[in-house]
């Protein structure tokens, strides 16, 4: 049994990503919206889930940018992200058994900043793994106005591009890529490998652009999720765990690549 049509397999082969429109049924899409709101309402909790913030470009207020490391504290989300269907889909694309590497939700509220041109691989491969697949779950509708994902089309090579000093894709190279907006609806899934260049613009609308970004790796390359979050908590902790006056900028190319988090 395959989870993908031949057309979707071709899209994956040619571009390194595939867009599954309306994949989740209405009930599950609503559950994901409800769960995302629950995580938004959770208080900051040092040593548990990790909340990161940004500053609104519109009002200057503190906005929740993302939450990470939450599946151990939410049964519903864990059941979905680590269930037979999702593992089966990702494993099919990988050609072997997949395992969860890390999980996050980007909230991108009105006034939220964009994410610079980047590939995920340079940050992910630091844990001794060569290949990852990220699944974006569209919580809200996303379009150009609220900062949808923009993907480089026709990039099927598994190679790391030349980078700027901050780890983002070299601007001269980025200018040559075929960038296209990828608009989504609630319940859409987008799966992409860790070498596909992507970015997004700021949210200039009055609506949120919430999305889950769930990353998996090959089981044969090890289960590194706990190692990842342990290292991130030490080197680039959430605001609630930071030591006043300590400089965390040295870890930004690994843990804040192309991101608006300060």
Swiss-Prot record:
Binds 1 Fe(2+) ion. Keywords: Dioxygenase, Iron, Metal-binding, Oxidoreductase. Activity is enhanced by ascorbate. Coiled coil: none annotated. Its cofactor is Fe(2+). 2-oxoglutarate binds at residue 108. InterPro entries: Phytyl_CoA_dOase-like. It is an enzyme of class 1 (oxidoreductase). One of its GO terms (molecular function) is iron ion binding. Disulfide bonds: none annotated. It catalyses: (2-aminoethyl)phosphonate + 2-oxoglutarate + O2 = (1R)-(2-amino-1-hydroxyethyl)phosphonate + succinate + CO2. Involved in the degradation of the organophosphonate 2-aminoethylphosphonic acid (2-AEP). Catalyzes the hydroxylation of 2-aminoethylphosphonic acid to yield (2-amino-1-hydroxyethyl)phosphonic acid. Belongs to the PhyH family. This is 2-aminoethylphosphonate dioxygenase. It comes from Uncultured bacterium HF130_AEPn_1. The gene is phnY.
């Amino acid at each position: 049994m395959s989870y993908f049509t031949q057309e979707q397999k071709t899209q994956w082969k040619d571009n390194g990503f595939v867009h599954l429109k309306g994949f989740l049924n209405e009930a599950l899409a609503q559950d994901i919206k409800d769960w995302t709101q629950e995580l938004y309402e959770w208080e900051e909790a040092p040593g548990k889930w990790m909340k990161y913030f940004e500053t609104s470009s519109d009002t200057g207020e503190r906005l929740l940018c993302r939450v990470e490391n939450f599946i151990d504290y939410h049964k519903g989300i864990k059941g979905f992200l680590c269930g037979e269907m999702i593992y089966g889909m990702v494993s099919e694309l990988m050609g072997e058994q997949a395992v969860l590497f890390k999980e996050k939700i980007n909230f991108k509220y009105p006034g939220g900043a964009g994410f610079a041109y980047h590939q995920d691989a340079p940050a992910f491969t630091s844990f001794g793994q060569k290949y990852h697949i990220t699944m974006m779950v569209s919580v809200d509708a996303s379009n150009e106005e609220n900062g949808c994902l923009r993907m480089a089309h026709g990039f099927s090579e598994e190679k790391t591009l030349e980078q700027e000093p901050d780890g983002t894709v070299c601007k001269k190279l980025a200018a040559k890529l075929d960038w296209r907006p990828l608009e989504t609806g609630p319940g859409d899934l987008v799966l992409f490998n860790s070498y596909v260049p992507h970015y997004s613009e700021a949210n200039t609308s009055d609506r949120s652009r919430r999305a889950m970004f769930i990353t998996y790796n090959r089981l044969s390359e090890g289960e590194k999720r706990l190692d990842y979050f342990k290292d991130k908590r030490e080197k680039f902790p959430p605001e609630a765990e930071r030591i006043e006056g300590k400089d965390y900028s040295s870890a930004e190319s690994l843990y804040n690549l192309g991101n608006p988090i300060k």
